[in-house]
Amino acid sequence: MDVDILLSLVLAFFGWAAIYFLTSRLSFGKRARLPPGPYPFPVIGNIFQLGQNPNQSLTKLAKTYGPLMSLKLGSNTTVVVSSPAVAREVLQKNDQVFSSRIIPHAAEAHAHHKYSMVWLQVSGLWRNLRKISKEHMFAAQRLDASEGLRQEKLQELHDYLVRCSTSNKAVNFGQTAFTTSLNFISSTFFSVDFAAYGSDSSQEFKDIVWRILKSYSTPNVADYFPVLKFMDPQGILQKNTFLFSKMFDIFDNIINERLMMRGSLDTSKKNDLLEALLNHSANNESEFSLNELKHMLLDLFLGGTETTSTTLEWAMAELLRNPEKLERVRAELHQVIGEKEIIHESDISRLPYLQAIVKETFRLHPIVPLLIPHKAEADVEINGYTVPKNSQILINVWASGRDSGTWLDPETFSPERFLHSEIDMKGRHFELIPFGAGRRICPGLPLAYRTLHTMLATCIHNFDWKLKDGMKPEDIDMEEKYGLTLQLAVPLNVIPVKL
């Protein structure tokens, strides 16, 4: 296309967009009162005010405009919630109206948004998938039955760290935790390990997961201006189509191999989640197809690996910076489980300080700082303002966790604040909702609760930790790397010392 023609088309589009933006803003102002917020620039709105770390930028803006704030991101109205009280209004009192999702263009790869528990609108299919996940994956009885597999993975983690300790080898703590999380899930689902410690395959899988999660949070012109979706201007949909294909190829190979085994004379039978889901699919193919199974597996691997490992890395970084708290939880572990190397999941309830450390880590470092965006299905009045239909709702749990009106010394890592508190992470106490709340709460919370506590306990109870090159604990870089998940910008490399 001739450059002059292309330039004219671009100018014409943005001229039209500017007129549309201004007139729509004025017309809406006549019929509804939006929550306060920074005045938007023509066309682009407040996009550039998000910065490199939107959770931090939005928290600063909320100090000026309040806990219920509106912005214009391109052509989309976005409402940001930054306090526990307003979060309760949205996710509890008005849960039904706000239970839908804003679909990022990145999630449309392989039509994932049409089959995903994460992105589906509340519907019969969504309810069926939630029911399957609850009954076949995360029910207490099924998790109890598969604890032996997780115990094996904890022992493998322990043995790997012993080898590193013997050779005085530093480990990338987040990468090590990721490998354990990945094998937790793959062994529970497929009876196989996807990775070995220190292997390239583990890093490759982690890179794929991170790139997909990053695509969901990368500012995307196609999301800000949906009329441009057909162009995929940043190539995000194309990249995700490739990444999803790699994940689906892995799942296809495993599923096909299992189906061949089931159809052969092989009498050996796996007692894992895949077997249960294949049985359910065979008996209810109209309700749960193999295609839906693959999309469900994609959600589970994305949601259950990076989130767990990143939370553990934040927890260990905070404990190394606060050695007196590390010693306190180690003493608790020694008192409760004694000389055992591996903690049992039934021990967690007897370890209140360990639980407090996990809660405090989530308070300061929520793994999904803005949760997954919600969508308003109708105009709703909250705190005297109108949240308009089809607007995007962001719940800034990072801001809620650092709210001085809710927490004493909010910037200080202090697990003690939870020792005599009824606050839990199950979506009932809006001061701490790292897994969300309401009907959209993360279905994997029961498994995450078990794995986080047992993995952290294994690392603390059996090992001391020292930093490389004489680095002091106070020198650990706690800067954030923003994505759909919130990571340490500089990976934590530490040397285990066997106790």
Swiss-Prot record:
Record localization: Membrane
Residues bearing carbohydrate: N55, N76, N279, N284
Annotated heme binding sites: C442
E.C. number: 1.14.-.-
KW Transmembrane (keyword) present: yes
Membrane-protein topology: Single-pass membrane protein
Coiled coil (residue ranges): none
MF annotations from Gene Ontology: heme binding; iron ion binding; monooxygenase activity; oxidoreductase activity, acting on paired donors, with incorporation or reduction of molecular oxygen
Alphabetized PANTHER family for the sequence: CYTOCHROME P450, FAMILY 76, SUBFAMILY C, POLYPEPTIDE 5-RELATED, GERANIOL 8-HYDROXYLASE-LIKE
Protein name, UniProt field: Cytochrome P450 76T24
Organism: Catharanthus roseus
Lineage: Eukaryota, Viridiplantae, Streptophyta, Embryophyta, Tracheophyta
